[in-house]
A protein has these predicted regions:
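Domain-level recognition of soluble alpha/beta enzyme cores
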Residues: 63, 116-137
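Generic beta-sheet signal
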Residues: 93-103
Length: 137
């Protein structure tokens, strides 16, 4: 359980639901929460707010195809943003870091620590809401 884990610091997306979650988790911990713009969810552009079934979701997440969609952040730029964030925090002297983020961000984190998934795996990889995933570097 998350309450049994100790953290040095909390990094969080600045988006509302993530902020609320981080504040709930931190309620009795009193840790510093750093809201980092790089943890924002991927910009879905024209698909923002639509159902995954209304567009080719797996193609949207295809790293190899790196499709360009109107006003959307392409997947390779998105992964680079997350990888830059992870490079920054893993170069610091933290023992345990909590990252409160979104499912798309978690796709990039999973690839950063465990190697880039195939296009057939990236799209369908979807952790449960409020799931706890552990990584070591």
């Amino acid at each position: 359980m998350l309450r049994d884990l100790a953290f040095d610091i909390i990094f969080c997306s600045p988006l509302k639901r993530a902020k609320q979650t981080a504040e709930i988790i931190n309620d009795d911990r009193g840790l510093n929460i750093i809201f980092d713009e790089r943890l924002r969810e991927r910009n879905y552009g024209e698909f923002e707010g639509t159902s995954k079934s209304s567009f080719d979701y797996n193609e949207f997440w295809s790293y190899q195809k790196n499709m360009k969609y109107e006003k959307a952040e392409n997947v390779q730029d998105f992964f680079k943003r997350i990888y830059d964030f992870l490079d920054d925090i893993t170069s610091k002297e933290y023992n345990n870091i909590l990252i409160v983020c979104h499912a798309g961000v978690e796709k990039a984190i999973e690839c950063y620590f465990n190697g880039l998934m195939s296009d057939d795996e990236i799209g369908p990889f979807l952790p449960d809401n409020a799931s706890v995933l552990k990584y070591s570097k």
